[in-house]
Every structure is written in C-alpha cells, then in structure tokens.
C-alpha cells in the first residue's frame, strides 16, 4: 500500500502560514458528511478531512452513517479521507499490533473503493498513549489530530482547546482548538479563529451535522452554516489536515511536544 503524496517536492519550499488558517475535520462517518456537509463546503471552496471508522454503528445503520460508495464520492469531490480505525477503540488501550491491524483494515477498505491510503489519523475519543504514537510513526502518517486535552479540561459536550503551534506540537499530536457540540457556541469559534495567527493554526473537530446517534457532539445545520459563513466572511484559509504539509515539515519532530490522554 502506498500513500498519496500531497506534500512538497524536493524543489519546493514551505509556504508561510497565513493568519486565520483553519483545518476542518469530521469524525465517525456520519451520514451528514455526504448529504449536507460535503455539498456546503464544496460551495464555499473549503477543504476538509473526513475520518472514517467501521466501528460504532457504521456497519449496521446506513440511515445515520455513510456508505463506502458515498465516502468514495467525498474523495472524488476533493475532500480527504482519513483513518479513524476499524473499531473506534480507544488507542491507549490497544497494543501497537492491535492498532496497526485496525489501521490496515481501513487502508484496505479505502483501496477497495479507489480511495488513497490515508496519510492522516484522528484519535478515537482523543485517547492516546506511547504505543499509538509508535504505530502511527511506523505506518508513516504525517499528521494525527487529537482533541483538547490535557491542556484544556475535557467536557463531554465539546469545548475550546489549544491552537496548533508547529514549533511546539509534534505532528502526530496536533491539538484541536475546538470540538463543537452543545457546550460550544459561536463565540468559541470566533475565539479559535482569533488564536490562528503568528504561525498558529486552528484545527476544529466536528462530528455529525447533526450527530443523530451522539447528541453530546451534535451541531445543527443552522449552527454549522453560521460557523462556515463566519469563516468565509473573515477570509479564512480552510483546508484538510493533509494540506498542512504545504506549511509544516512533518519530518521535523526533534524536541516537539508529545502529550498523552487521558
């Protein structure tokens, strides 16, 4: 299996990180990724990463979760498909071999449907330990997105988190500046964007719009459109996680901070 290269060639240089650089990510393969989120982002010209797992009720409830054919269509529309593991198991409870097997399963499912092998990863429930970092490094992932902890207190219904500072954070523990849900509002989104300056990047972790099976991370379509309108009105550069490679050299990891949670 080979990963598609969305980075820079040896003759290219990294682009300067613009202020208001925002990364959009969506976890769990909710049906709204295909029916609502993807079409809206396409109209706005925004990039995004959709992290896919076959855990939760993905295999049994196609009213609330995307099909692999729909995932392929999201890829065809230019969005990134990232790896969220086979079973959505907390990575800090798995051995390296167990996590690698979960990662490879999603890789193979992507290949079966003509989707590039993922080069980015989203930690299920933000849980991570040393063996998870080792597994991702061994598999050649460029970037892995985590949640808001341990820097910010965990709230099951969303909240603020640290902005990503490439000079500080290891690329396999990219923090979320916000996890929208019932405990997260418009002022929190504005706060995240305002932190995205001086080389720092706001990474946002969404789930379903709406998240029918998981109301604790639900965002309504009306809320979501308000958020996206703000990003557009404020001339934000909105990208997928893989596109960080245009601005950040993921191979430079010496001295970068790695945090585990919980």
Regions found by a protein language model. Give the residues of each.
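Non-membrane alpha-helical structural segments and their capping/turn regions in soluble enzymes
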Residues: 96-101, 186, 218-221, 225
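Hydrophobic "anchor" residues on beta-strands that sit immediately upstream
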Residues: 23-24, 80
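DG-centered beta-turn motif at the end of beta-strands
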Residues: 24-29, 182
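A Trp-anchored, charged/polar loop motif used as the substrate-binding/catalytic surface
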Residues: 180-191
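Short acidic, Gly/Ser-rich segments with clustered Asp/Glu that frequently serve as metal-coordination loops
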Residues: 29-35
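Short amphipathic alpha-helical segments and helix-helix/interface helices
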Residues: 35-38, 68-72, 133-137, 190-193, ...
């Amino acid at each position: 299996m080979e990963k598609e290269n969305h980075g820079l060639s040896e003759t290219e240089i990294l682009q300067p990180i613009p202020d208001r650089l925002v990364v959009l990510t969506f976890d769990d393969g909710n049906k709204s990724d295909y029916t609502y989120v993807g079409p809206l982002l396409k109209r706005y010209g925004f990039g995004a990463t959709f992290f896919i797992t076959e855990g939760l009720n993905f295999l049994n409830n196609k009213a609330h979760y995307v099909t692999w054919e729909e995932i392929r269509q999201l890829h065809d529309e230019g969005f990134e498909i990232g790896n969220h593991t086979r079973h959505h198991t907390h990575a800090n409870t798995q051995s390296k071999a167990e996590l690698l097997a979960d990662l490879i399963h999603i890789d193979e499912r992507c290949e079966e449907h003509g989707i590039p092998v993922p080069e980015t990863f989203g930690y299920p429930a933000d849980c991570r330990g040393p063996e998870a970092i080792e597994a991702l490094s061994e598999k050649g992932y460029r970037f892995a997105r985590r949640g808001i902890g341990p820097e910010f207190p965990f709230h099951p219904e969303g909240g603020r988190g640290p902005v990503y500072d490439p000079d500080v954070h290891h690329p396999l523990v990219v923090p979320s500046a916000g996890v929208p849900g019932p405990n997260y509002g418009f002022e929190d989104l504005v706060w995240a964007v305002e932190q995205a300056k001086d080389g720092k990047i706001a990474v946002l972790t969404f789930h379903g719009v709406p998240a029918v099976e998981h109301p604790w991370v639900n965002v309504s379509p009306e809320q979501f459109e308000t958020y996206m309108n703000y990003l557009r009105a404020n001339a934000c550069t909105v990208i997928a996680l893989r596109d960080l490679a245009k601005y950040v050299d993921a191979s430079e990891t010496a001295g970068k901070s790695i945090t585990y949670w919980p």
